């Protein structure tokens, strides 16, 4: 399963770490994924993985069970 936000589609970013000598090493910035139970418009409940930022938005919209 891909490390991807189920609602927004966000995934990890890639880039380089730079030391003091400016040596480049590839690295990834992963999402802070959380499992959460969500209720849709029909009232059915299901589990999805969302990022912490999306989780804050869902809590604000009161969509979390």
Curated annotation (Swiss-Prot):
InterPro entries: Bacterial_rp_bL28 (IPR050096), Ribosomal_bL28 (IPR026569), Ribosomal_bL28/bL31-like_sf (IPR034704), Ribosomal_bL28_bact-type (IPR001383), Ribosomal_bL28_sf (IPR037147)
Gene Ontology terms: biological process: translation
Domain of life: Bacteria
Pfam family, one: Ribosomal_L28
GO MF term set: structural constituent of ribosome
Signal sequence interval, chain numbering: none
SUPFAM superfamilies hit by this protein: L28p-like
Compositionally biased residues, Polar residues: 11-22
Keyword field: Ribonucleoprotein, Ribosomal protein
Ranges where the record places region Disordered: 1-26
Gene Ontology terms: cellular component: ribonucleoprotein complex; ribosome
PANTHER family (alphabetical): 50S RIBOSOMAL PROTEIN L28 (PTHR39080), LARGE RIBOSOMAL SUBUNIT PROTEIN BL28A (PTHR39080:SF1)
Family annotation (HAMAP family): Ribosomal_bL28
Family: Belongs to the bacterial ribosomal protein bL28 family.
Protein name per UniProt: Large ribosomal subunit protein bL28
Gene that this sequence comes from: rpmB
């Amino acid at each position: 399963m891909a490390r991807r936000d189920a609602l927004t589609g966000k995934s990890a970013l890639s880039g380089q770490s730079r030391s003091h000598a400016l040596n480049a090493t590839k690295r990834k910035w992963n999402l802070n994924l959380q499992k959460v139970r969500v209720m849709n418009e029909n009232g059915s409940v299901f589990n999805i993985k969302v990022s912490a930022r999306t989780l804050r938005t869902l809590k604000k919209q009161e969509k979390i069970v």
